[in-house]
Curated annotation (Swiss-Prot):
Keyword flag Membrane: yes
GO cellular component: plasma membrane
HAMAP family referenced in this protein's UniProt entry, alphabetically: MscL
Protein source organism: Methylibium petroleiphilum (strain ATCC BAA-1232 / LMG 22953 / PM1)
Classification via Gene3D superfamilies: Large-conductance mechanosensitive channel, MscL, domain 1
Taxonomic lineage: Bacteria, Pseudomonadati, Pseudomonadota, Betaproteobacteria, Burkholderiales
Gene responsible for this protein: mscL
Organism superkingdom: Bacteria
Role played: Channel that opens in response to stretch forces in the membrane lipid bilayer. May participate in the regulation of osmotic pressure changes within the cell.
Protein name per Swiss-Prot or TrEMBL: Large-conductance mechanosensitive channel
InterPro entries according to UniProt: Mechanosensitive_channel_CS, MS_channel, MSC/AndL, MscL_channel
Length: 137
């Protein structure tokens, strides 16, 4: 088998194509969920907590004056910028919850497929059972 025919066989298999479609749809879906979190949910969270913007929370490690914006504090020296981590962690928690709700809804809407009937036993198994039953008599 030539290299190209092997590659063609590999690339045309259903799993590879399914994976490619999943990656493309996942990328598009990620943008939708990012928009839901960033444009719809985070403004509500910010409003509930008095307009907090966690991204500017930091601890100055080089003796910066308190109250500087994060960008200026970084110019003045090293900072422990924990606020951005809080924002990303909160976004992740909201994102995970939204995805959980969506998957739960999708699973609820899926129709339960009836279980496949059990496969009949192989011929050798049937023969062995007949021999066993004959020996018991």
């Amino acid at each position: 088998m030539s290299f190209f025919s092997e590659f063609k066989e590999f690339a045309v298999k259903g799993n590879v194509i399914d994976l490619a479609v999943g990656v493309i749809i996942g990328g598009a879906f990620g943008k939708i969920v990012d928009s839901i979190v960033g444009d719809l949910i985070m403004p509500i969270v910010s409003k509930l907590f008095g307009g907090l913007d966690f991204s500017n929370y930091y601890v100055g490690l080089a003796g910066q004056a308190a109250g500087l914006p994060l960008a200026e504090a970084k110019k003045a020296g090293a900072v422990f910028a924990y606020g951005n981590f809080i924002t990303v962690a909160l976004n992740f928690a909201i994102l995970a919850f939204i995805i959980f709700l969506m998957i739960k809804q999708i699973n609820r809407l899926k129709k339960d497929e009836p279980a496949a009937p059990p496969a009949p036993p192989a011929e050798d198994i049937v023969l062995l059972r007949e021999i066993r039953d004959a020996l018991k008599k």
